[in-house]
Amino acid sequence: MISLTTLDLLLSINEGEMIEEIILTLLASPQLAIFFEKHPRLKRALLKDIPGWKHDLQQRIKEALIPVTLAEEFQLYQQILSANTNYFYLKLPDILETLNRIESPFSEEAQKLATNTIADSNTLQTLFIQRWRISLILQTTTFHKQLLEQEKEQLLAELQQKLTLSGNLDPVFSENDRAAGRLWDMSKSQLNHSQNDKQLLIHYSEFLHQQPELKKLAQLLGRSQSVKSKPQENHFFEPVTTIERTPDIIPEQVNGIGQSDDILRLLPIELAILGIEDLEYEFYRKLVEKKLLTYRLQGDNWREKTTLQPVTHYSQEEKPQGPFIICVDTSGSMGKFNEKCAKAFCLALLRIALADNRNCHIMLFTTGIVHYELSSPDGLEQATRFLSQTFKGGTDLAFCLTSTIEKMKEKCWKNADAVVISDFIAQRLPNSLIHQIKNLQLHQQYRFHAVSMSQYGKPDIMRIFDHIWHFDTGLKSRLLRKWRH
């Protein structure tokens, strides 16, 4: 069976122009035009998919087989194409019969040409073949358009699903063009999922919008950067000037009172002690210790002294922003409103990760660990699975932090920021684990953040974190926040 690409090649049909035409028609559709006007960032992300669409359409044409009747007609055309005049007239009745049997669009015109009285037989043969070729090109082009039209409708249906999902999530996720592009890529994995999954993402994004302080807290945490001092490799000698005090040879004037053993400058009170027999030994003791009160004469000389000393320069460098490893406490005390806040906070960090091209990994810790990779190609699917979880487990913070440290050892999680969301009502951490965390903070510049959802968290546990972010979910705090907004 002849493929469509082969037929295009033999008939010199430019399939690239037809693909360009079908894509332009697709982009000009009213559905896309309205969406592009509303979400310009997603438009730029969608336009990056055009080369992929062209490749897919070319592959579809390459794999397509032409109809049997068209293949039979083309093979008959090839046989006559190189035939001489005698053979052409000999086969002409069979050609007309075959064209009529397969119901070729060229059949009627072929009958008219065959009955036409043209004196030159070569002219009739040339005209017949030219008209037949035009008919074959027209049939092939029509088949092309039918095939591409089917692909366009299918692509438009998929785009409408992606546009609906991306458009709903655009306000919460698309902070810049990079975030819009990653959101568009991740929306591909959501096409076959239920409407409930999509509504779950929208529900938590709306909840986050209702909690502006929680959203602001995520912004502060996500955008924070630590600064580290980096010593320069080369040491330099720099002149250092100091002031030295040296005694002057010639005293000039009385400048105060001091302690010395200078008999000539004794104060009268000291001479009076010498005249009292009971205090005479006290006078000699002060004399030996040079503690007699005497007049101090101005005779000190101060001069500058410059020496070369080695100096090490330090440069302040901002630590590069790394990925997020978010540890979420799913114990019973983190249920209800705490659960909603924790999930919404994770969505806010995912927004920052998409905007800054950072990875985002979630670990749910109870008595075990459940992992979700939110920045993967199926990130939205992972996010809906995470949001559908319920918090009814226990609390094993030590095991979660140990797993986080192991995760940080992987190359792709270098310079990661660990974020622990909990009420921190948990058991005391082992000393060995605390020592590991301190080493990571001190020597490898890793940062550990605590997001406390309760005012009753244990200070001993939270002391290991670089930053502690408080978001009290108690009834009083919730009412105060609602009253303020």
Swiss-Prot record:
Subcellular location as annotated = Cytoplasm
Name the major location. Answer: cytoplasm
Gene3D superfamilies in alphabetical order: von Willebrand factor, type A domain (3.40.50.410)
Q: Which domain of life is it from?
A: Bacteria
Q: Which Pfam families match?
A: VWA_CoxE
SMART domains documented for this protein: VWA (SM00327)
List cellular component terms (GO). cytosol
* Cell cycle in keyword set: no
Read off the HAMAP family from this record: ViaA
Summarizing the function annotation, the protein's role is: Component of the RavA-ViaA chaperone complex, which may act on the membrane to optimize the function of some of the respiratory chains. ViaA stimulates the ATPase activity of RavA.
Q: Which NCBIfam families match?
A: PRK10997.1
The record's subunit annotation is:
Homodimer. Interacts with RavA.
Protein family: Belongs to the ViaA family.
Name of the molecule in the record: Regulatory protein ViaA
Give the species: Photorhabdus laumondii subsp. laumondii (strain DSM 15139 / CIP 105565 / TT01)
